[in-house]
Amino acid sequence: MTNELGDIGFGYRPRAAYATDPALSRGRLFDEVESPTRTPFQRDRDRIIHSTAFRRLKHKTQVFIAHEGDHYRTRLTHSIEVAQIARAVARALRGDEDLAEAVALVHDFGHTPFGHTGEDALNDKMAAWGGFDHNAQSLRIVTRLEARYAEFDGLNLTWETLEGLVKHNGPLTDASGKGLKGPVPQAIRDYSQMQDLELDRFAGIEAQCAAIADDIAYNTHDIDDGLRAGLLTLDMLKTVSLPGKILEGVRQRYPRLDDVRTGHELMRRQITAMVEDVIVSATANLERVGPRSADAVRAAGETMVTFSAEMAAAEKELKAFLYKHLYRHEEVMRVRAGAEQIVRDLFDVYFADPRAMPDGWREGLDRAEDRIKARSVADFLAGMTDTYALKEHRRLFDRTPDLS
């Protein structure tokens, strides 16, 4: 496959006609003087990196609860890895690397403590008030909750970064406004009333690069963490077509290599294989459709940045393997049950008595209607790190589940 790529990924070629041009950005909700030294998308990336929400990702879980070890991935390390892959794919496709990086870095801002376990628990608790969705929460953080600037709430990111954050996995509605996968979260609908995010159209090419980079990163690095935890073995991976084929090649080339380095070599080669497959497949898609502008990508009616059919099938098989042997492993499930209980307990306490929350969060909630109170509690809870949630539970309860 590398021969098909030539120097495609080296960044020597000019920006494509279908790329998102920062000079033509649709701007920000609140007008600002543009920087003389950075493009709008570079400013977005920098604002994301300097935000409090970005730093909190350091202590938020991917698969393994952060308490379990210092070398497992967190939302922060995952986001950095996604950003690196997104830049590589965007560079090869001649898109705007900075926009792809910005979307990648911000895409996990709305995740709760304890990964998807925490999100499921909070979504259940919020069922009567519209539920909880981490993409909608990411939007709330960067448009309302992050308090850094004198003239506006949030980060005042460009339209293109917000569009990518909300729609990196595809359109949310049909042309009539009906949700494609159920009701669209109210936070997204409300913001789109102020700055139309065109929820019925696809995102630009750069957001699509970030989305597939997310898939590549977690499909590969969850294997790495699973091997480190002893829940997966190299012999188990032999039964899965993509890592199995790569592992065979590594062992043939390095027959005396120890298992740790063999695992790292497997991860490195798997990322390379998936990235190169995406570049070739996306290039073919773009040549077939022939978009001549960023808006033409949005109106194309399909995702352009995709795996080949063969790689998509291999990725589906790998996801099924990880779900069965890692995400549903009895040890992971035991810890998740405790984490779920922590989130549920905290929500119940804060909702029943907002005075249990810090001053900045509880103000005015004693007289607020339940809908507003519940959303404020969800905002506070979703912003917690794993470590802070554990600390709060120990402060408020006599007994806290053991997550070790």
From Swiss-Prot:
- What does the entry give for GO biological process? dGTP catabolic process
Coiled-coil segments on the chain, per record: none
Q: Which organism is it from?
A: Mesorhizobium japonicum (strain LMG 29417 / CECT 9101 / MAFF 303099) (Mesorhizobium loti (strain MAFF 303099))
Looking at the record, the residues that make up the HD domain are 75-219
Which GO MF term does the entry hold, naming one? dGTPase activity
What name does UniProt use for this protein? Deoxyguanosinetriphosphate triphosphohydrolase-like protein 1
Please give the Pfam families that the UniProt record associates with this protein.
Answer: HD, HD_assoc
Q: The organism sits in which domain of life? A: Bacteria
* Keyword Oxidoreductase in annotation: no
Respond yes or no to whether keyword Hydrolase is given for this record. Answer: yes
Alphabetical keyword list: Hydrolase
Please name the HAMAP family in this protein's record. Answer: dGTPase_type2 (MF_01212)
**What InterPro entries does UniProt report for this protein, alphabetically?**
dGTPase, dGTPase-like, dNTPase_2, HD/PDEase_dom, HD_domain, PHydrolase_assoc_dom
Family under the similarity heading: Belongs to the dGTPase family. Type 2 subfamily.
Query: Per its UniProt record, what SUPFAM superfamilies does this chain match?
Result: HD-domain/PDEase-like (SSF109604)
Q: Which PANTHER family match?
A: DEOXYGUANOSINETRIPHOSPHATE TRIPHOSPHOHYDROLASE-LIKE PROTEIN, DEOXYNUCLEOSIDE TRIPHOSPHATE TRIPHOSPHOHYDROLASE
